[in-house]
Curated annotation (Swiss-Prot):
It is found in: Plastid, Chloroplast. Keywords: Chloroplast, mRNA processing, Plastid, RNA-binding, tRNA processing. One of its GO terms (molecular function) is RNA binding. It comes from the Eukaryota. This is Maturase K. The gene is matK. The keyword RNA-binding applies. One of its GO terms (biological process) is RNA splicing.
Amino acid sequence: MDEFHRCGKEDSFWQPCFLYPLFFQEDLYAISHDHYLDVSSSSRPMEHLSSNDQLSFLTVKRLIGQIRQQNHSIVLFVNCDPNPLADRKKSFYSESVLEALTLVLEVPFSIWSKSSVEGMNECKSFRSIHSIFPFLEDKFPHSNSILDARIPYSIHPEILVRTFRRWIRDAPSLHPLRSVLYDYRNSPENLQRSIIVVPRVNTRFFLFLLNYYVWECESILFSRLKRSSHSRSLAHGSFPQRTHFHRKIKHIIIFSRRNSLKSIWSLKDPKIHYVRYGERPIIAIKGADLLVKKCRYYLLIFRQFYFHLWSEPYRVCSHQLSKNCSSSPGYFLRVRMNPLLVRTKTLDELFIPVLITNEMDPIVPIVPIIGLLATEKFCDISGRPISKLSWTSLTDDDILDRFDQIWRNLFHYYSGSFDRDGLYRIKYILLLSCAKTLACKHKSTIRVVRKELGPELFKKSFSKEREFDSLPFSSKAAARSQRERIWHSDIPQINPLANSWQKIQDLKIENLFDQ
């Protein structure tokens, strides 16, 4: 596979033209066979296969022909079907073929994605959740509108195959993909409907489809954004001191008019910025309302004509940051005016100018979080803690660890907010819910539990806060907590409660448009 990748770099024309012969390479199925065994053994216990159940290359070749038959859809997608009728042996061979198909399609996709990232160096593309928060800090205060453009989750199988056809000239290599996608629908009456391109099972094939679909959407959008902005992004900021002027001069370009001795100085400042987390791209725009309407109209038309997909209007929402809040990602986001007093002393007199700067103000959604905790049976709808009855069968250490993990995730994720006082209300709810759960398990009272455990109750989270407050750069963290914030760098992913709250917000928007 590495050799094929090197050949694809040396000859870009050969790479997309001869993919179909790879389906008949025994090494390819050996790789997919080993990968399937590793995934199966890690996810669930698997019986030892006898010598007659080992991978047979002739059987795989026969199965390639059987994929095109309609009556083998249950065999291929046994893990997706709620009523599987195929045996394990057939599922084993079908999963091997799916792994082989994914390996073949991943080779050109890896080359395309790498070349596209190399071509977007001026766009400063970062692929990490930690790049979301610097984006919010840097771009949101200097934008007056945002577009919340959710990626369409459904697309017709033939449209997806044709997007592959634009990049792969080898048409026979796409026949297995077309057969797999059409068999995935499992019923002839759904021929006119669209399929969901979200992985219903944790297989490599469906994850690849999702990644390719998102990459296809973003590659077109990036090319359009680069046309609208021919220079890289500049970090905004006020420069009240002369020592900071060199930062500004570095981002100034000079060009001359024809037949003119005058030079024009232009500050490189694009007006459109893009970020994405999950399936929710966010486009920050600095401009008039007409520019925002044009961008929203372009996104709707782009999805309609490029993917032949009608996108509901509520899936592309525009917000004015100065008037109302936006929800992203798990925060209420707004932009507030922050007056900055600058004293400039000269020889003659003293000037005291006042600079008005914008600052992003992320707000912790306390009421929605309490509602989610009530849904998970940690408290009632009014925020009164209750016992988690489903956890009473666990050990005391497991109960303490689970409550501690929930609080640590919430505290770390929402530490970037200025006002974190509402988080301690959440901590109070979790603390009493944990005590009530332990009291219900041991058939005692909360007073007895708190007397027996003492500092052991939420000990880890308390020590984590003390460790954070005792850092050298935050010796006065208690006094500065209301005016400074630090984003924790150990956030591995979007908080699950933030995802749940975001889904509730999406349902509210959909119901509003349905009315």
